[in-house]
């Protein structure tokens, strides 16, 4: 059986990789969205690990609700990205900072 520390280490590594990905790649909006989703999945892994370790199902149910909200968030983010690409012909973050209402 895999110990709790292994899951927490994996979650910390995934979280750190996503933070590094956000800081290293600030130009591509798709990569930024993927790094944010990876960060959320790392937190969810820690929720599931603690939930299993403590024998409580509340953490796993909470992760289920987080994943449904994250799926809706991803769909909305990608829809906004498609509209921005149609209007500006780019997904470069540096060129999208001057949005007009």
From Swiss-Prot:
Does the keyword Transmembrane feature in the UniProt annotation?
yes
Q: What class of enzyme is it?
A: translocase
UniProt-listed Enzyme Commission number(s): 7.1.1.-
Q: Which HAMAP family match?
A: NDH1_NuoK
One MF term from GO for this chain?
A: quinone binding
Q: Please list the GO biological process terms of this entry.
A: ATP synthesis coupled electron transport
Assembly: NDH-1 is composed of 14 different subunits. Subunits NuoA, H, J, K, L, M, N constitute the membrane sector of the complex.
Q: Would you name any one GO CC term?
A: NADH dehydrogenase complex
Q: Where do the TM regions start and end?
A: 4-24, 30-50, 61-81
Species: Leptothrix cholodnii (strain ATCC 51168 / LMG 8142 / SP-6)
Protein's UniProt keywords contain Endoplasmic reticulum: no
Q: Provide this UniProt record's keywords sorted from A to Z.
A: Cell inner membrane, Cell membrane, Membrane, NAD, Quinone, Translocase, Transmembrane, Transmembrane helix, Transport, Ubiquinone
What protein name is recorded for this chain?
NADH-quinone oxidoreductase subunit K
PANTHER family this protein is in?
Answer: NADH DEHYDROGENASE SUBUNIT 4L-RELATED, NADH-UBIQUINONE OXIDOREDUCTASE SUBUNIT ND4L
Q: What does this protein do?
A: NDH-1 shuttles electrons from NADH, via FMN and iron-sulfur (Fe-S) centers, to quinones in the respiratory chain. The immediate electron acceptor for the enzyme in this species is believed to be ubiquinone. Couples the redox reaction to proton translocation (for every two electrons transferred, four hydrogen ions are translocated across the cytoplasmic membrane), and thus conserves the redox energy in a proton gradient.
Q: Which family does it belong to?
A: Belongs to the complex I subunit 4L family.
Q: Which reaction does it catalyse?
A: a quinone + NADH + 5 H(+)(in) = a quinol + NAD(+) + 4 H(+)(out)
The subcellular localization recorded is: Cell inner membrane
Indicate where this protein is primarily found.
Answer: membrane
Q: Which InterPro entries match?
A: NADH_UbQ_OxRdtase_chain4L/K, NUOK/Mnh_C1-like
GN (gene name): nuoK
Q: How does it sit in the membrane?
A: Multi-pass membrane protein
């Amino acid at each position: 059986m895999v110990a709790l520390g292994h899951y927490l280490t994996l979650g910390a590594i995934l979280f750190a990789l996503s933070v590094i990905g956000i800081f290293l790649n600030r130009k591509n909006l798709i990569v930024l969205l993927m790094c944010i989703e990876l960060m959320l999945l790392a937190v969810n892994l820690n929720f599931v690990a603690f939930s299993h370790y403590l024998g409580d199902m509340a953490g796993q149910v909470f992760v289920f609700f987080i994943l449904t909200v994250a799926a809706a968030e991803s769909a909305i983010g990608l829809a906004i990205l498609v509209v921005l690409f149609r209007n500006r012909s780019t997904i470069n973050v540096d060129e999208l900072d001057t949005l007009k209402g």
